[in-house]
Amino acid sequence: MFVAEDMYQLGSQRSAIRELFEYGKQRAAVVGAENVYDFSLGNPTVPAPDCVNETIRDLTQKLDSISLHGYTSAQGDIETRQAIADYLNKTYETAFSADNFYLTMGAAASLSVCFRALTTSPEDEFITIAPFFPEYRVFVEANGAKLVVVPPHTSDFQIDFEALEKAISAHTKGVIINSPNNPSGAVYSKETIQKLAALLTKKSEENGTPIFILADEPYREIAYDGVEVPYVTKYYANTLVCYSYSKSLSLPGERIGYVIVPDEVTESKTVYAAIAGAGRALGYVCAPSMFQKVIASCVGLSLIHISEPTRQEAIS
């Protein structure tokens, strides 16, 4: 075969999620979309906030096309990065600046550049807690590392710390956490994050090298009934936050998100530069320019107040 076998396999065989999505479209054509309940892709059924369309309208009317559609800085427009930092600082009492952010084509790109930046050997490992988004394995392996899966406590899908500690080795580069979790919906409490931080601090010292938390957070705002989703960087210094606006602003097809590299990260400027280099090597330079401007205007809005009535109707 004159093409890469692993890439051929990925391209010729859909994931189970994609298979279900395509099957759902086929069934909708037969029985009507209103009769098909699609639990495959995370496509929101709630429209984007009015701010999104209003901002797009204003941008197309007031900006020239070169300014609107041209390249931004590789790491993203500084005004957008600062707007995100200001919002997070106000909301979570963090202390980020624009320089902590690298804007990406969504959380998938964020994770991919982090895996590429941190992987230095084919023996390197990233751990995740089951159940998990199946593309984690694709992203990790495509960037030259191995994915290690740790089973959760099956009663509540929380972290089994005994199993996690056994899984950590001298090759562990990071632990991927996804809270609120896709697909279980589990949320890790502050106490859980603190316990995870203590374990990784201990293991980092034993290994003589930092073990990172990669906090995959596209569902951060989708937590109900007063459930708190702790901001992980406040509890563990070596945390890289991978975020997408796909869910919070109902923009999955626009591919816009970011990586945060806090100043507290070990050799943070080196890590940031490696992430920027990974973005360059993987072709993820310059997130969609118009939607960078949309995010600057709409940052902080969430669909939770819109989707809550739908949720209540579904569970009543």
Go through each PLM region and give its residues.
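N-terminal small-domain helix-loop-helix segment of the aminotransferase-like
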Residues: 2, 6-106, 298-300
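Short catalytic/ligand-binding loop motif for oxyanion handling, primarily in non-cytosolic enzymes
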Residues: 45-49, 183-186, 221-222, 250-252
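Positively charged, low-complexity/disordered segments
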Residues: 308-310, 315
